[in-house]
Amino acid sequence: MTTTSKSILLLISDAVVRSAVRDALEHGGYLVTAVGDLGTAVDRLMESPPDLLIIRSYIEDIPGYDAATYLRTRQPGLKVLMIGGLIDDDRLVNRMTLEGFEFFPKPYPAAALIEKVKEVLDKRH
């Protein structure tokens, strides 16, 4: 395992999925703060701004895009990787593209997720 100083705020409401993704990211050498709700995510973001936000396409009953946009108002320039099922709403895909959000569809094998995270972190805004 290679250790990196890059930090990730992981926002996934499902505890089982959150734990699996956190474990994969930590195994990839990332410093991960894993939370299950938007309120806690805001608190953690303000305490220690991460290098990357990874968020599911839905958090509780809130679209992940809306939650990520809200978090980005708290930390402008925050890199965002949304993970989840395929998005079939062209307007949402266009808004995500304009915002610079990245998307990674499930299933997300650990090695592929780690590679995508590295790619997003290496990108310049």
Go through each PLM region and give its residues.
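Acidic phosphotransfer microenvironment of two-component signaling modules
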Residues: A15, G36-T40, A111
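Alpha4 helix (beta4-alpha4-beta5 surface) of REC/receiver domains from two-component response regulators
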Residues: D66, G84-P105, A111, E115
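Conserved phosphotransfer microenvironments
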Residues: I55-T69, I87
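Two-component/phosphorelay signaling modules centered on CheY-like receiver
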Residues: D14-T33
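Acidic, metal-coordinating helix/loop segments flanking the phosphotransfer/catalytic sites
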Residues: A34-L52
